[in-house]
């Protein structure tokens, strides 16, 4: 048994030695007379046909502030080298070889809109050569490329970016084409190994080929587009809904009584909270004046509304604590805020009848005094008639004359007391009128600012072109190897 194992081991070793020897001979024969600077074409007038296939693995990051997108991509180049052909039967049935980077000719294809500090970030891997002369070069790399990101509809935005590939020096000597074999309709990137991104959905990956002229030389360029759509759940739950709730809680401040002392404090706190959300948007958006993100416009309108509501609340507090000795309510103010606006807002004061101001009462009293002047003349005539009565009434008249001054004095005190009570009652009435006016302004502000917030929110977000659109999202299953 042991002898059999030794024989098998020797045969295996001899087979490996033969294979290694065949591979060595093949490499030696292929390298003989080969110059990696020479284009692999038999006719120098013909271009080298190179196919490019992008294998997208992951969308790493979308940097809106710096307008840079980071991808993990495998760039697969294929071309035919006529000097790399051999007959497998002559070399131990070897059909492919792994040749180190730099040994063979390689197209100088670069990502033109690269934002990487090293420009070309691909890793120099080996080249795979087949016996028919086909060369496969698939270097992986982390690509960073610039893209003009439009933040107008952020966070309900869609972005279309492209990767621009082309030869740096060969011009028309290199015919660059898109390798889209076995790819779905409308997709020019290989998404077999794509890992979905948590912030953006990949909608489509079209591509096209374009020829340009530079310094009297024709160059072929390939544009690989990426249609991205932002996922909005995070921003809706953490930005938009909280800001709407903060705005509504600010409106509820109009239902708080002025005496509690926290009315304006609540609104100022909400105002500062919205300012924090606006600062968060400024951290994400690029410092450009081309467009304002729609969510920044929403926060700006919310800040304006909250600022105006704070001013209205301060005016309400001022009106609430007004005193009739310091401020006089005008006739139009009284009519609008104590009669018409309460009627319009369905507000009423229980068991209350609006009284005329004191100045109007004085006018009526003056008119009453003028009308009573004739009564005093009649009273003097009656007194003269009494003086002509018989002497039987003299004693009673004397008694009445002696008590009249005391009665007049008592009546005078009663009038003063009544006037004091009337003044106090009217003053209290005016104080209540000012307070009721403040309540009316609060109620009107409640309805007005509620309508403004809901109306502004609806108008702004209804303008989003893709708020309710349902694009077909590319979904890939994980590849298990």
UniProtKB/Swiss-Prot annotation:
The chain crosses the membrane at residues 236-256, 264-284, 292-312, 444-464. CDD domains: LGIC_ECD_nAChR, LGIC_TM_cation. Disulfide bonds join 147-161. The keyword Kinase does not apply. Keywords: Cell membrane, Disulfide bond, Glycoprotein, Ion channel, Ion transport, Ligand-gated ion channel, Membrane, Postsynaptic cell membrane, Receptor, Signal, Synapse, Transmembrane, Transmembrane helix, Transport. GO terms for biological process: chemical synaptic transmission; determination of adult lifespan; monoatomic ion transmembrane transport; multicellular organismal reproductive process; nematode pharyngeal pumping; neuromuscular synaptic transmission; regulation of membrane potential. The keyword Repressor does not apply. GO terms for molecular function: acetylcholine-gated monoatomic cation-selective channel activity; excitatory extracellular ligand-gated monoatomic ion channel activity; transmembrane signaling receptor activity; transmitter-gated monoatomic ion channel activity involved in regulation of postsynaptic membrane potential. Residues 20-235 are extracellular. It is found in: Postsynaptic cell membrane; Cell membrane. After binding acetylcholine, the AChR responds by an extensive change in conformation that affects all subunits and leads to opening of an ion-conducting channel across the plasma membrane. Nicotinic acetylcholine receptor in the MC pharyngeal motor neuron involved in pharyngeal pumping. Has a role in the determination of life span possibly via calorific restriction which affects growth rate, although this is independent of metabolic activity. Neuronal AChR seems to be composed of two different type of subunits: alpha and beta. NCBIfam families: LIC. PANTHER family: NEUROTRANSMITTER GATED ION CHANNEL (PTHR18945). This is Neuronal acetylcholine receptor subunit eat-2.
């Amino acid at each position: 048994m042991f002898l059999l194992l030794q024989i098998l081991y020797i045969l295996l070793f001899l087979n490996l030695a033969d294979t290694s020897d065949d591979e060595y001979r093949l490499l030696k024969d292929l390298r003989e007379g080969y110059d990696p600077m020479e284009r692999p074409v038999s006719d120098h007038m013909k271009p080298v046909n190179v196919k490019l296939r992008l294998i997208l693995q992951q969308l790493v990051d979308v940097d809106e502030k710096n307008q840079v997108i980071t991808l993990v991509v495998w760039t697969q180049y294929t071309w035919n080298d006529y000097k790399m052909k051999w007959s497998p039967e002559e070399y131990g049935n070897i059909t492919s070889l792994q040749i180190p980077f730099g040994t063979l000719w390689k197209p100088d294809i670069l990502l033109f809109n690269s934002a990487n500090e090293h420009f070309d970030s691909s890793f120099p891997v080996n080249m795979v050569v087949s016996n028919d002369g086909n060369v496969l070069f698939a270097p992986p790399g982390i690509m960073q490329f610039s893209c003009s990101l439009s933040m107008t509809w952020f966070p309900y935005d869609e972005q279309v970016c492209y990767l621009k590939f082309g030869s740096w020096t060969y011009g028309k000597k290199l015919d660059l084409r898109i390798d889209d074999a076995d790819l779905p309709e409308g997709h020019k990137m290989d998404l077999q190994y794509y890992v979905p991104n948590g912030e953006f959905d990949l909608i489509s990956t079209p591509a096209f080929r374009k020829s340009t002229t530079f310094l009297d030389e024709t160059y072929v360029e390939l544009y690989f587009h990426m249609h991205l759509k932002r996922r909005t759940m995070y921003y809706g739950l953490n930005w938009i809904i909280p800001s709407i709730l903060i705005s509504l809680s600010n409106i509820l401040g109009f239902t708080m009584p002025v005496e509690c002392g926290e009315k304006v404090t609540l609104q100022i706190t909400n105002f500062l909270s919205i300012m924090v959300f606006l600062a968060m948007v400024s951290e994400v958006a690029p410092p450009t004046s081309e467009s304002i993100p729609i969510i920044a416009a929403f926060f700006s309108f919310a800040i304006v509304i909250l600022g105006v509501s704070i001013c209205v609340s301060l005016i309400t507090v001022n009106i609430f604590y007004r005193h009739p000795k310091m401020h006089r309510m005008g006739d139009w103010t009284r009519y609008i805020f104590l009669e018409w606006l309460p009627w319009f807002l369905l507000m009423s004061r229980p068991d209350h009848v609006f009284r005329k101001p004191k100045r109007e009462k004085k006018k009526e009293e003056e008119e009453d005094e003028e009308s009573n002047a004739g009564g005093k003349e009649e009273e003097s005539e009656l007194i003269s008639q009494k003086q002509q009565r018989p002497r039987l009434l003299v004693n009673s008249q004397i008694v009445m004359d002696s008590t009249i001054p005391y009665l007049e004095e008592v009546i005078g005190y009663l009038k003063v007391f009544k006037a004091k009570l009337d003044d106090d009652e009217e003053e209290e009435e005016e104080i209540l009128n000012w307070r009721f006016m403040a309540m009316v302004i609060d109620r009107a502000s409640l309805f007005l600012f509620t309508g403004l917030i809901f109306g502004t929110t609806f108008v702004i977000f209804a303008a989003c072109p893709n708020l309710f659109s349902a694009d077909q999202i590319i979904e890939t299953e994980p590849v298990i190897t």
